[in-house]
Amino acid sequence: MADGSKVFKKTSPDGKITVYLAKRDYVDHVEFVEPVDGMIVIDPEYQKEKKVFVTMTCAFRYGRDDMELIGLSFRKDIYVQSCQVHPPLPGEKKALTPLQEKLKAKLGANAFPFSFNMATNLPCSVTLQPGPEDSGKACGVDFEVKGFWGDDVEEKVSKKNVARLIIRKVQYAPETAGAAPHAEITKQFMMSDKPLQLEASLNKEIHYHGEPIIVNVKINNSTNKIVKKIKITVEQITDVVLYSLDKYTKVVCCEEMNDTVAANSAFTKAYQVTPLLANNTEKRGLALDGKLKHGDTNLASSTTLRPGMDKEVMGILVSYKIRVNLMASRGGILGDLISSDVSVELPLILMHPKPAEGTTSAEDVVIEEFARQKLQGEQDDDEDKEEAS
C-alpha cells in the first residue's frame, strides 16, 4: 500500500471525539506551507447539544513547567487558527480533499472535515534538548492540532474532552544550491619573514544530516614555525529571538588531526567530519528537529528565511559553522609555550533532502494510533498521565 494512504488518529480520553490527520510532518516550501487537512469523528450523542471545534496552535515554550506553578508563564502562543466543525457554520463548506473523501467514506456520517493553512512566516518545529535533571515538556517551538467540544472556542475545557496531536513544520533542502563555501587567511608572525597561509573549503553548500562533510585544508607554511595540530570543529549556533537576544553556541563535532606541517613546506589534505546527535545526547539546550521521539530525532536543521521575513517571529533560528584551527609553534621543548593559533570559519547548511512525493492510493486507508512521543530525559506531565489512564 502506498505511504500516502497512512492516516494517524488520536482519541480524547473520554472517547467522544477522534481526530484524524494524513501525516505528522508538514513541509514549509518557503513560499507556501502544506495545508493541514483532517477529519474529526464526533460521538452521535454529542452532536445533539455540543459544539465541536478544532484549533491549530504554534507555541513557543521557553521555561520549565514547575515555574508556572508560582504564577510565571513560560509559554507564548505565536499563532492560533480555529474552526467550528459542528454544527457547521453557514458559508464555510469547502470541497473535500481526496484523502478526506476516502476517510468520509470509511468513517461515515459522524466524520466532519477541517482544514488549516499555515502562515508562511511561522517558525519551524525546534526542540531544545533537556538535561538529565529536567522534567516536564521540552523547551522549543511546537505545533498542536486540538479537537474538543464546548460552548465556545475560547472556553477552558477539561483535558479529558480534548484530543491533542503534535505535528511538525519542517523545511527540506532546496533543489538548487549556491557556491561551495571557501575561506582563507594569511598570518604574519613576529621574527618570521614570510607568512603562513591557511585555506579551507567544502565540496558543496548544503549537506544532509548524517552525511560525512568533506573539509579541504590547504596550508602554505613559509614561516619558521611548525604546525603541530589541526583541529576541525562543527558548531551549532542557536538564536532565541522571540523573547530575548540569547545566542547559544555548542560544539557538535570536534576532530583533532595528528598531521604536522614543517617549517617552509606546503600541505594539502581532505578531512571528513560528521556531526551526529548520537554523540551529543547529554548536551542540554542543543537544538533538535521537532520530532519528539529520541531515537527518531536529529540535530536541528538550518533555518531558511524568505527575503524580507521578520526574524523575531521565527522564535528560534539555527545555523552552523565549521572552524578549522591550526596551532603553530617553534620546535623544542618550550615551543608550545609560545604557540599561535590560526583559524578560518566556513558556513554550513545542514538539512534533510526533500523526500520523494507520496502517491495517493485508491486502496483503503491504514489508520495508526497517534501516541505522544518524548525526548530522552523528558518526563510525563499531568496531561500525558491523564490521557494514559
From Swiss-Prot:
Keyword Glycoprotein in annotation: no
GO MF, one annotated term: G protein-coupled receptor binding
Gene3D superfamilies for this protein: 2.60.40.640, 2.60.40.840
Keywords of this entry: Sensory transduction, Vision
Signal peptide location: none
SMART domains linked: Arrestin_C
One of the protein's GO biological processes: G protein-coupled receptor internalization
InterPro entries in the record: Arrestin (IPR000698), Arrestin-like_C (IPR014752), Arrestin-like_N (IPR011021), Arrestin_C-like (IPR011022), Arrestin_CS (IPR017864), Arrestin_N (IPR014753), Ig_E-set (IPR014756)
Tissue expression notes: Retina and pineal gland.
Keyword Cell wall biogenesis/degradation: no
Record family assignment: Belongs to the arrestin family.
Function: May play a role in an as yet undefined retina-specific signal transduction. Could bind to photoactivated-phosphorylated red/green opsins.
Protein name: Arrestin-C
Species per Swiss-Prot/TrEMBL record: Lithobates pipiens
